Amino acid sequence: MTENNPTRCGYVAIVGRPNVGKSTLLNHILGQKLAITSRKPQTTRHNMLGIKTEGDVQAIYVDTPGMHKANDKALNRYMNRNASAALKDVDVVIFVVDRTRWTDEDQLVLERVQYVTGPLIIAVNKTDRMDEKAELIPHLQWLQEQLPNAEVVPISAQQGHNLEALEALIAKHLPENDHFFPEDQITDRSSRFLAAELVREKIMRQLGAELPYQITVEIEEFKQQGHVLHIHALILVERDGQKKIIIGDKGERIKRIGSDARKDMETLFDAKVMLNLWVKVKGGWSDDERALRSLGYGDL
């Protein structure tokens, strides 16, 4: 604590519909890639903490899965429960919306956050894409009318526009507390978890329109030998056809997935990485609560 500034620390939930820019926002605030991103909805499946300590202020961000209407599989129910649970026991809630469109799933999130009793901030994303800034004003006014107790901040998560103002507003609302984490800690997640997420991100980016959503990644080995990290990752799918898609013609696609994931791992872990990937069919895992628990999806 400095003479004029109290030490502040608290939890900040980042919520919104799928693919609205929540993970991109977290990565930009942290100044490094922690949460995986892609253009595909439901890229984020787990709540994850991203911790930023700056001077007397420690903000502990909770990146959440996008709230969505699909509830037909156990995996969908898990993600929706995770996102809703993040609204409880946090000090600040950031509701991320996309300036360019409003969907039924945005409305679903709005109906959840209207019951938030603590500080609520609406982060209006992608405002850098507007040719006429005057067009933004009616949209901001409409949001303010929907959530009159919220503060509205236009941002660009991708470009970093106005994030300093957003962070200053968050810091103002954090309670006076000693810091909960060491200054150099940036997440609560293990290296094994982060490695699995990087592989899954590369799969989602490589597959495009062919993407089978019933994919998960399990790290079977994570071992340091000298200056080299040896990582063995198992990619689980539900059907033989999905396995063929991931492997690709003569194994070319899985080679690209492995190469791209390895490069990001070497940056994240600051070490040389030897990465081996396997693909295995496990039918129905995404709707099997026991299988989901064994794969690290927690309480269902």
UniProtKB/Swiss-Prot annotation:
Region called G5, residue ranges: 155-157
Topology in the lipid bilayer: Peripheral membrane protein
UniProt-annotated stretches for the region G1: 16-23
Residues the entry annotates as binding GTP: 16-23, 63-67, 125-128
CC per GO annotation: cytosol; plasma membrane
Alphabetized UniProt keyword annotations: Cell inner membrane, Cell membrane, Cytoplasm, GTP-binding, Membrane, Nucleotide-binding, Ribosome biogenesis, RNA-binding, rRNA-binding
Annotated region (G4), positions in chain: 125-128
Annotated region (G3), positions in chain: 63-66
InterPro entries in UniProt: G_ERA_dom, GTP-bd, GTPase_Era-like, KH_dom-like_a/b, KH_dom_type_2, KH_sf_prok-type, P-loop_NTPase, Small_GTP-bd
Annotated region (G2), positions in chain: 42-46
Family from the record: Belongs to the TRAFAC class TrmE-Era-EngA-EngB-Septin-like GTPase superfamily. Era GTPase family.
Binding partners and assembly: Monomer.
Name of the protein this chain belongs to: GTPase Era
